[in-house]
Amino acid sequence: MLVCVSGRSGVTVGAEKAFQLARKNGKATMVFVSKCDLENANYFKILEDMKIKFGSTVCPCVVPAKLDDGTPVYINLFSQKAFKYEGGKQIQVELPDIGHRFQGLIEAMSEAIAETDDELMEKFFGGEPFTTEEIVEGMRKGVKDGLITPVFCGSAVNLQALDMLLYNMHKLLPSPAHDAFILAENANGEPVELHCTEEEPTAAYVFKTVADPFVGKLSYLRVISGKVTAGEPLTNARTGEVEKISKPLTVIGKKQVDADGIGAGDIGAVAKLVSAKTGDTLCDASRVVKMPAPVFPLPSLFMAVTVAKKGDEGKISSALARLMEEDPTLSYLNNAETHQQIIGGLGEQHLDVVKAKLKNKFGVEIGLRSEEHTSELQSPTNL
């Protein structure tokens, strides 16, 4: 799991919760500190804050510095080389002087790696430097076992040091195939072990739903076992309905690319599933199992919808129904007494996002105001 932290605002409550959730679920964790090219960024202060909030596993691997002319550069502590970026392209530069910090960072990283293996610990205390292979293997083992939380930095907007982040995500984070198994349950509530292999019957978890105005509903899947292929019938463990898979897709940003299939351990997307919702498990009929579904918070703020353009009332209902497929925390109802259309969400910001999505995705403009007779409003029912 990658936790993102701003180089200006530091460790937010959301970042802290994400880290704790990853730890609770035994997930390997990596941190990326962005916006390090900005004038008021303070990486080393944030690093100390992370050590307090995330614990002693925090281990910096790439740190920012500046050249004499103020150009931001990034020091790779693995290779002990520095790089600047022009148009997203990496250019090696002379290692800048960051004082006593440099040697301290190298020693801290070496000590963290040494703690992953007895032989490495002996080598560390003997004053012998680690080989590149030992550094990579020790770091990988430490990340997998939760002993090391590598910290990288850069600028996401200006494409600085992202190459080092992506390379090390590939090298250091464990593959899903490294997990012994994932527990699901069958129709009788009995535990079933799912292994990350294409040899087992297919089981895929719907982790996200997107309302696409062009292709319709797009369901994002993580394939736990087996392989999702075009034309394959899969059973929805929640409803018992059979979904026929259209073309599996690989999603790269906004681009959707046709794929031959989505194998165990991979994620992808499928369009136009009928019954599938976020949290559902789609399985081969020979082994119907269910992954634990998330528990979503209930709406806490309800507001009346006003139509900006006459005649859009009908469009609002259908557009909101589409948005509710991708956002289970959103609700919609018609108040029979006041004849108002009411939407419910988690707060003002949430409803503002819904308002913007209605306009951008479906061309429907609405206004929001306080509803009438809130005391008589019944519990919302989802479409």
Functional labels for PLM-detected ranges:
Residues 1-375, 379:
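Structural and coupling elements of P-loop NTPases
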